[in-house]
Curated annotation (Swiss-Prot):
Converts heme B (protoheme IX) to heme O by substitution of the vinyl group on carbon 2 of heme B porphyrin ring with a hydroxyethyl farnesyl side group. The keyword Plastid does not apply. GO terms for cellular component: plasma membrane. Pfam families: UbiA (PF01040). It catalyses: heme b + (2E,6E)-farnesyl diphosphate + H2O = Fe(II)-heme o + diphosphate. This is Protoheme IX farnesyltransferase. The chain crosses the membrane at residues 29-49, 51-71, 101-121, 123-143, 150-170, 177-197, 223-243, 244-264, 274-294.
Length: 301
């Protein structure tokens, strides 16, 4: 006689499966992205953000971002299994099948789109869908393997969140929101190129034409330094157009100076582990920069 399956015996399996699905959504990346969405929402209005677009917008955008991340896991499952940084992901390890990953990504993305379309506005729903396609299909499935400028071109999809937050509240485009997009668009190459330097051998092993693989590490270091200077200029644009005040100006200047210095060190004073230090600094740079935007908005404006 077969032994009945107990509820308690199935709990560990459920826990492992749930964690695997959650991991596929790249929660840390989505969390940073949602911060930029929130800032876009807050800067779009002079006072408090209306509750419905705030909650529904954050939920819908988070779901579609998680869907894009899951599709990234699905498309990259072969190369992920060959790289030390990613070999332990759910798909290469067989914790989730490709079919289930596709169903999960499609379901999550569809639900997110429905939430945005019905509870926020169609403009935000379609813009978020375009970002999903841009990241999951245009970048991951094509650009990543096609050109060393993959990060530069594909970075536009990842730079959209502040605009999505803005349109979720206002249902319209605004030049100020585009300035925030420009900041993230300019921030993306030095952020990813620093990681690519650290993981150059792994990218070369799986034939991904990241800039350090195709043009060499020294050329990439120069590009990182130049982009941090461009980023510093981009970060000043909100001040120049009167969008932000002195609180943001001071914070932005300090953060830009720090990023340029780290990039200069990488170029002229490199040592083991410095590329990853630059990569981590870039994350804090973006997070603190957008927190400064928020602080300035409520303290100065």
């Amino acid at each position: 006689m077969a032994k009945p399956l107990s509820i308690t015996s199935s709990l560990p399996t459920f826990s492992v499966t749930w964690r695997a699905y959650f991991e596929m959504t790249k929660p840390k990346v989505v969390a940073l992205m949602l911060l930029t969405v929130l800032v876009g929402m807050c800067l779009a209005v002079p006072h408090a953000v209306p509750v419905q677009p705030l909650l529904a917008g954050m939920l819908g955008i988070a779901m579609m971002a998680g869907s894009a991340a899951a599709l990234n896991h699905l498309i990259d499952r072969r190369i992920d299994g060959l790289m030390a940084r990613t070999y332990n992901r759910p798909l290469p390890k067989g914790r989730i099948s490709a079919t289930r990953a596709l169903i999960f990504a499609a379901s999550l993305g569809s639900l997110g789109f429905i939430v945005l379309y019905s509870l926020v506005n169609p403009l935000t729903a379609w813009l978020t869908f375009a970002s999903l396609i841009g990241y999951a299909l245009v970048y991951t499935a094509y650009l990543k393997r096609a050109t060393s400028q993959n990060i530069v071109i594909g970075g536009l999809a990842g730079a959209m969140p502040p605009l999505l937050g803005w349109t979720a509240v206002t249902n319209e485009f605004h030049g100020h929101a585009l300035l925030l997009v420009i900041i993230i668009f300019t921030w993306t190459p030095p952020h990813f190129w620093a990681l690519a330097i650290h993981r150059r051998a792994e990218y070369a092993k799986v034939d991904i034409p990241m800039l350090p693989v195709t043009h060499g590490v020294e050329f990439t270091k120069t590009c990182i330094l130049l982009y941090t200077v461009l980023l510093a200029i981009a970060c000043l644009l909100p001040v120049l157009v009167g969008m932000c005040g002195p609180v943001y100006f001071v914070c932005s200047s300090l953060l830009s100076t720090g990023f340029i210095y780290k990039a200069w060190q990488l170029k002229y004073r490199d040592h083991d582990g410095l590329a990853m230090q630059v990569f981590r600094f870039s994350i804090y740079h973006l997070m603190l920069l957008f927190m400064a935007l928020l602080l300035d908005h409520y303290l100065w404006n």
